[in-house]
């Protein structure tokens, strides 16, 4: 299968994790978009969705799926989203699309995190993909200096503003051997909203597209 075919296959496979009569959380990105397109075929089975970005909310609305504010719902049964990188320990780098903070919030509320990805996203060690860090604008230079002390090379994603009105620093040249530790350390820097490491709240299930079909991986 091509990469696009793998993405479509995992998007379809994720439908089996959608509970009837519930509200679900949905991520942001190309694979999440394909999942939304598949979800539209069974939209009558769910009560609605909580979106992790304005882009996702708009796509859901285009399909006639009700979008709910997270503050109006309680715990979500499932959150379905892609990843920029993922290990077999279910640790991820996310946020290539800049929606990492809202993705992390919605994932935290969900009982189960289903990651959908093609096989190119599976890695042994995180860090080849630049790690996004969402930062309060006035703290950009300070945070960049602090990240440099941690061994990273931050690059300002110029011209991009998050849905929360903040900026993104993409951190290059990290060899992330301890994702939980680094996630915590980065989040302790004053001015950092959050970073794209999803290690403290890792995925529960990975649906990975391969040449042979969809492989289900759990820890």
Swiss-Prot record:
GO terms for molecular function: ribose-5-phosphate isomerase activity. GO terms for biological process: D-ribose metabolic process; pentose-phosphate shunt, non-oxidative branch. One of its GO terms (cellular component) is cytosol. Homodimer. The keyword Isomerase applies. Substrate binds at residues 28-31, 81-84, 94-97, 121. Keywords: Isomerase. The active site is at 103 (proton acceptor). This is Ribose-5-phosphate isomerase A. Belongs to the ribose 5-phosphate isomerase family. The gene is rpiA. Pathway: Carbohydrate degradation; pentose phosphate pathway; D-ribose 5-phosphate from D-ribulose 5-phosphate (non-oxidative stage): step 1/1. It catalyses: aldehydo-D-ribose 5-phosphate = D-ribulose 5-phosphate. Catalyzes the reversible conversion of ribose-5-phosphate to ribulose 5-phosphate. Signal peptide: none annotated. InterPro entries: NagB/RpiA_transferase-like, Ribose5P_isomerase_typA_subgr, Ribose5P_isomerase_type_A. The keyword Repressor does not apply. It comes from Nitrosomonas europaea (strain ATCC 19718 / CIP 103999 / KCTC 2705 / NBRC 14298).
């Amino acid at each position: 299968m091509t990469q696009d075919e793998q993405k479509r296959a995992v998007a379809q496979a994720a439908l089996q994790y959608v509970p009837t009569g519930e509200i679900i959380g949905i991520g942001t990105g190309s694979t999440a978009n394909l999942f939304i397109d598949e979800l539209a075929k069974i939209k009558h089975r769910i009560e609605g969705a909580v979106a992790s970005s304005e882009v996702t909310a708009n796509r859901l609305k285009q399909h006639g799926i009700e979008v709910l504010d997270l503050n109006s719902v309680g715990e979500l049964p499932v959150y379905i989203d892609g990843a920029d990188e993922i290990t077999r320990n279910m640790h991820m780098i996310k946020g290539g699309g800049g929606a990492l903070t809202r993705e992390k919030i919605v994932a935290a509320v969900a009982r189960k995190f289903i990651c959908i990805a093609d096989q190119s996203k599976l890695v042994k060690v995180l860090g080849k993909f630049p790690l996004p860090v969402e930062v309060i604008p006035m703290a950009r230079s300070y945070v960049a200096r602090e990240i440099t002390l941690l061994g990273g090379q931050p690059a300002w994603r110029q011209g991009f503003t998050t849905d929360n009105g903040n900026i993104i620093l993409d951190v290059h040249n990290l060899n992330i051997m301890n994702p939980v530790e680094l996630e915590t350390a980065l989040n302790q820097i004053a001015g950092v909203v959050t970073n794209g490491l999803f290690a403290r709240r890792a995925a529960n299930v990975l649906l990975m597209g391969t040449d042979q079909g969809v492989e289900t991986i759990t820890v």
